[in-house]
Amino acid sequence: MQPFIHENFLLQNKHAEVLYHDYAKSLPIIDYHCHLSAKEIAEDRRFHDMTELWLEGDHYKWRAMRALGVEEKYITGNASPEEKFQAWAKTVPYCIGNPLYHWTHLELKRYFQVDALLNERTWREIWNHCNDLLRQEGFSARSFMVKSNVEWIGTTDDPLDDLADHQAIAQDPSFLVKIVPSFRPDAVIEINRPSFLDYVGKLGEALACRFMITISCCKPLENRVRYFHEKGCRMADHGLESMPYSECGWKEANDIFQKRKNGFVLSREEEEKYKTSTLCFLARLYHSLGWVMQLHIGSIRNTNEKMFRRLGPNTGYDSIHDFFLAQPLNAFLNELERRDQLPKTIVYTLNPAYNYVVASTVGNFQSEGVKGKVPIWRSLGGFNDSFKMAFIRHLTDLANVGVFSTFVGMLTDSRSFVSYVRHEYFRRIVCNLIGSWIEKGEVPQDYDFLGKIVQDVCYFNAKQYFQVGVSGG
């Protein structure tokens, strides 16, 4: 009997098989947005068991377990690692239709040579087998990246990070995977957060004057950007609940900042103006340095107050947001473009309802000599939607409104060192989609041409777009 994960998994016709095996399969991986720990890579972390590797910090799995009524002690509580793995194994069969089902079995197959399906009957054998392998050489954090043919990844880093771990990795000639930092200044943007003033204090009292009329007073924040640039950073990353845009001069922005510093609660309009001013300032700085700006738009964070107090952030209690997007996004990009200060910008929309809105918007702000300067990327998997169907919809929407071949490829957005099978998953979906177009007579059977598009979407577009490792990049 053929195993569930086989060489033609998800490839539903001969055209898809040719495109995947001849053009996509062997390409390196560029994972330009993830949440891996640079410290764990620098130390080449070893994992004691599969619970550490698989379940530690993976709130996608936690959400699935909670949906089945699993007790929290088996998710984030004090149950033993073995008990937590067993609880996850019992959950897996009920995740059919969810990307977790496919990802789980792809990871078992690719890294541990396990063909069996994970469930209540097989969990102990798989637990013992995988744990035995984890104790061997070749199953450390770095080893998983090398096995996966990773070329470089982009981590997510606080402006206050000294990036010492990134530098230690870069100076190690035995490890060739590039670990590139990304500048994530959400703590400076979210002015109404209770932690805002404490964070600003850490940046230094000089930050208080950064919105005066002369741009030279923005030095505290600008200095961190330039520090990151010196350490190899070429990307910024912003998480935005909604897209702010309300025009605001430097003096007014400074007045709003001073009001917040003095302990006052800001109005929604004041918050929007501050965020707009800060984002525009940073975007212009990114442009001057040749950075890529990433905008993750539309996630409501920590919606369950009781569980947030109990477990903290990033534990599986975020949701897709709905709001007015077209006007503020167009206005923001236009404000930068009219001054020739729009950096390369990736717009991520969590809500599939905004696919056409964003795709039609980014088409307004392309540039001569830059392929896909402002692409759309739909973040997937984090809210238990069907990755496969959602990605097909996203790629089809992009093809309908824009240019499919400019898509900048896959990212994991993950905290796991075995998540790189998601790139394989994406590549199989892309090849199957194009293969289905050939099968239906919608595109010509030109494997060389279509194979080049597959390779661009899966690897070369990202390589060209980010220019990591290129002289000056």
From Swiss-Prot:
This is Uronate isomerase. The keyword Manganese does not apply. Gene3D superfamilies: Metal-dependent hydrolases, uronate isomerase, domain 2, chain A. Keywords: Isomerase. One of its GO terms (biological process) is D-glucuronate catabolic process. GO terms for molecular function: glucuronate isomerase activity. It comes from the Bacteria. Pfam families: UxaC. It comes from Geobacillus stearothermophilus. It catalyses: D-glucuronate = D-fructuronate; aldehydo-D-galacturonate = keto-D-tagaturonate. Belongs to the metallo-dependent hydrolases superfamily. Uronate isomerase family. Its EC number is 5.3.1.12. The keyword Isomerase applies. Pathway: Carbohydrate metabolism; pentose and glucuronate interconversion.
